[in-house]
């Protein structure tokens, strides 16, 4: 999730994760619409590094919003790389299409409009074996998205998920006020499943919202 920069974030962004005009325009538009819930620039850079380190070519993004994270990732892909970006809200789909059209990597991004629960099975039918999934969508569905990833991300592939601290609710023994009990329970289940060392080599990077990174071992 994007946030007001601390001195540390400002330093990191200035050295390693400077936004160009396109990324800055996306961030500004989301802020204007009061939906600035995209990842930060430093997290975009981290996604690029993960893609490069794992030689990822095929990525599924669940929750695209205005395309900010998709563009960060697409820029790290090789010439034959591709992202399937799932976006549910029609307003967000339209926004993202406009920004993708301005991007030099627009041919590497296919936006899929609709409910991820309906779209993901169609991607499975294309053969699966994707190199990476980035999950940044409805938190209650994270276990369902992990179910899909377990079947469709290749062995050695990456599962990355944002907001896995659930606004700090994961540090509590019961759902705090403002967090639906089912959402709290499902996020705990998601995190605990990734902690299974027989299936994943995983951790949560302690960003303000928590960014889970897992290598699938099976």
Task: Tell me the role of every PLM-derived stretch.
Residues 1-132, 139-160, 164-218:
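A short alpha-helical cap/connector motif
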């Amino acid at each position: 999730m994007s946030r007001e920069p601390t001195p540390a974030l400002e330093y990191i962004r200035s050295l390693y994760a400077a936004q160009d005009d396109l990324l800055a325009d996306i961030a500004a538009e989301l802020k204007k619409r009061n939906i600035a819930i995209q990842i930060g620039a430093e997290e975009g850079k981290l996604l690029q590094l993960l893609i490069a380190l794992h030689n990822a070519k095929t990525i599924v993004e669940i929750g695209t919003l205005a395309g900010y994270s998709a563009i960060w990732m697409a820029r790290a892909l090789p010439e034959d790389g591709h992202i399937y970006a799932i976006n549910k809200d029609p307003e967000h789909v339209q926004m993202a299409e406009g920004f993708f059209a301005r991007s030099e990597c627009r041919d590497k991004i296919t936006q899929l409009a609709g409910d991820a629960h309906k779209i993901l099975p169609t991607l499975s039918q294309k053969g699966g074996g994707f190199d990476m999934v980035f999950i940044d969508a409805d938190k209650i569905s994270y276990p369902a998205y992990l179910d899909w990833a377990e079947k469709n991300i290749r062995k050695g592939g990456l599962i990355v998920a944002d907001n896995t601290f659930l606004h700090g609710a994961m540090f509590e023994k019961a759902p705090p006020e403002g967090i639906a009990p089912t959402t709290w329970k499902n996020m705990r289940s998601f995190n605990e499943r990734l902690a299974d060392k027989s299936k994943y080599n995983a951790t949560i990077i302690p960003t303000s919202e928590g960014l889970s990174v897992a290598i699938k071992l099976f």
